[in-house]
From Swiss-Prot:
The keyword Disulfide bond applies. It is a single-pass type I membrane protein. The gene is LINGO4. One of its GO terms (cellular component) is extracellular space. Disulfide bonds join 435-484. PANTHER family: KEKKON 5, ISOFORM A, SYNAPTIC ADHESION-LIKE MOLECULE SALM. It comes from Homo sapiens (Human). GO terms for biological process: positive regulation of synapse assembly. This is Leucine-rich repeat and immunoglobulin-like domain-containing nogo receptor-interacting protein 4. Residues 358-412 form the LRRCT domain. Residues 29-60 form the LRRNT domain. Residues 412-502 form the Ig-like C2-type domain. Residues 1-28 form the signal peptide. Its main location: membrane.
Length: 593
């Protein structure tokens, strides 16, 4: 058989990736055929190339390696150890399920490692050994269930850790041990049921903590104790969080606090009192209905308050009392009908005011906004009037400096309807005083006691929602003059009403209430002054008769004994002195009483 007719050797087709892996690499070597390379910086871009293994022949001076969006399933020990100058490695959106200990050995210059969008399940010790210079680690969108003790112990330079969108249910107390420089930690969209306080306490340099979209219903007292350097805390989308424990933020020295899209029904004043360095407070999208007066005053350095998208219906006068540095308020998209100037300690210092999306009534209470409208930053949507009807829908910036008659005016409060001026009630009975008024804006109704104290909405003597004064179980001390005061921002009016209490005399000489009885048990019986005199007379006469009779019998017995002797003589024998042989009888006479 000649060479021309001899059968050719059939070589099996080699996979192209195998050739890539066999290509030699050296300093400044050629770029792998399946990748794109740049020189400034020294980057090898192999993303979204359907790769199932790391290509060979990577230049040794590579500073950025992008392997994202491929089909890599694992990293073996030492696979990238020759890339000692590598600073950024992107392995995101592959199929990595395991990382062998030492997989990143030799990457002592690596600063950024992106592993999001893989299938990693457990982070154990030794996985990140050799990454002594790493500053950013992104583990989002994996299937991580738990962090074991020492999982990040080799990352002494790590500053930012992202671990959101995992199945995380447990963080061991020592999981973050060794992260001495970690400054930013984000835990979001996990299955944690409690805040891992013991693990967080191992982060002495933590500055920013973000806890987002967690099904945690309580932040217990001391949960974040030990984070003395923490400045920014964000709690976002905890639908089960209805309140903060008073000691939940103890030990923190925050400058920014955001608790948004939770279920807080009121501002957590008790938990905030000690945060004297707080500058930014964001409570947006919580069902908070009011900001009361003077409750924020302990936050002396507060500059910004955001409470947009809540349920605010009122901001009280002096609500921001004591906040001398306050300059930004965002209360957009609420149910506020007004915002009075007296809420602010210095309205002229206000720089930014977000007030759009509120049903504002444009009356005299908003004149101060007209005065400052050219200097205030209202954002993209300036506030607009929802009433009265002749200005409805008109933006505050559309009004001229000279207002037409009837614009932005108020009507003083006047009492229009009241009950009788003199009310008589029996002791133990029920008394009601009615009082209401007219005005624009609608006035509030208050009542004052006879001794000058204002009455509240609870107790035996209380003011009802419609302004009616109710006194239950009337007592003698309730008598006197009660003053009804109706007031609004334009003025006030008052009316005095008297209450006279009739003391109820108990029947049959008793002071007890005959209507209050217990079946089968006789009630207490009390005597009046006449009854007491009769009892004393009945008891004293028999006693006096008995004493007189006794003395009479004694006198008769004494008379029957004859003449009364007043002296008596007694004979006695005295001791005889020695030598005295002539001793006669001795006698002594005693006087009888």
């Amino acid at each position: 058989m000649d060479a021309a007719t001899a059968p050719k050797q059939a070589w099996p087709p080699w996979p192209p990736l195998l050739f890539l892996l066999l290509l030699p690499g050296g300093s400044g070597g050629s770029c792998p055929a399946v990748c794109d390379c740049t020189s400034q910086p020294q980057a090898v871009l192999c993303g979204h190339r359907q790769l199932e293994a790391v290509p060979g022949g990577l230049p040794l001076d590579t500073e950025l390696l992008d392997l994202s969006g491929n089909r890599l399933w694992g990293l073996q020990q030492g696979m990238l150890s020759r890339l000692s100058l590598l600073q950024e490695l992107d392995l995101s959106y592959n199929q990595l399920s395991t990382l062998e200990p030492g997989a990143f050995h030799g990457l002592q210059s690596l600063l950024t490692l992106r592993l999001q969008g893989n299938r990693l399940r457990i982070m154990g010790p030794g996985v990140f050994s050799g990454l002594s210079a790493l500053t950013l680690l992104d583990l989002r969108l994996n299937q991580i269930v738990l962090f074991l003790d020492g999982a990040f112990g080799e990352l002494g330079s790590l500053q930012k850790l992202e671990v959101g969108d995992n199945h995380l249910v447990f963080v061991a107390p020592g999981a973050f041990a060794g992260l001495a420089k970690l400054s930013t930690l984000t835990l979001e969209r996990c299955n944690l049921s409690t805040v891992p306080g013991l693990a967080l306490a191992r982060l002495p340099a933590l500055v920013a903590l973000r806890l987002r979209e967690l099904d945690i219903g309580r932040l217990p007292a001391g949960a974040l104790r030990g984070l003395g350097q923490l400045k920014e805390l964000e709690i976002h989308l905890w639908p089960s969080l209805e309140a903060l424990d008073p000691g939940s933020l103890v030990g923190l020295n925050l400058s920014s606090l955001a608790i948004t899209r939770c279920n807080l029904s009121s501002v957590p004043f008790q938990a905030l009192y000690h945060l004297s360095f707080l500058r930014v407070l964001d409570l947006s999208q919580n069902p908070i209905s009011a900001i009361p007066a003077r409750r924020l005053s302990p936050l002396v350095r507060l500059q910004e308050l955001r409470l947009s998208g809540a349920c605010l219906t009122s901001i009280a006068a002096h609500a921001f009392h004591g906040l001398t540095a306050f300059h930004l308020l965002d209360v957009a998209d609420n149910a506020l009908q007004t915002l009075e100037e007296t809420a602010f300690p210095s309205p002229d210092k206000l720089v930014t005011l977000r007030l759009s999306g509120n049903p504002l009534t444009c009356d005299c209470r908003l004149l101060w906004l007209l005065r400052l409208r050219r200097h205030l930053d209202f954002g993209m949507s300036p506030p607009a009037c929802a009433g009265p009807h002749h200005v409805q829908g008109k933006s505050l910036k559309e009004f001229s400096d000279i207002l037409p008659p009837g614009h932005f005016t108020c009507k003083p409060a006047l009492i229009r309807k009241s009950g009788p001026r003199w009310v008589i009630a029996e002791e133990g009975g029920h008394a009601v005083f009615s009082c209401s008024g007219d005005g624009d804006p609608a006035p509030t109704v208050s009542w004052m006691r006879p001794h000058g104290a204002w009455l509240g909405r609870a107790g035996r003597v209380r003011v009802l929602e419609d302004g009616t004064l109710e006194i239950r179980s009337v007592q003698l001390r309730d008598r006197g003059a009660y003053v009804c005061v109706v007031s609004n921002v334009a003025g006030n009016d008052s009316l005095r009403t008297w209450l006279e209490v009739i003391q109820v005399e108990p029947p049959n000489g008793t002071l007890s209430d005959p209507n209050i009885t217990v079946p089968g048990i006789p009630g207490p019986f009390f005597l009046d002054s006449r009854g007491v005199a009769m009892v004393l007379a009945v008891g004293f006469l028999p006693f006096l008769t008995s004493v007189t009779l006794c003395f009479g019998l004694i006198a008769l017995w004494s008379k029957g004994k004859g003449r009364v002797k007043h002296h008596m003589t007694f004979d006695f024998v005295a001791p005889r002195p020695s030598g005295d042989k002539n001793s006669g009888g001795n006698r002594v006479t005693a006087k009888l009483f």
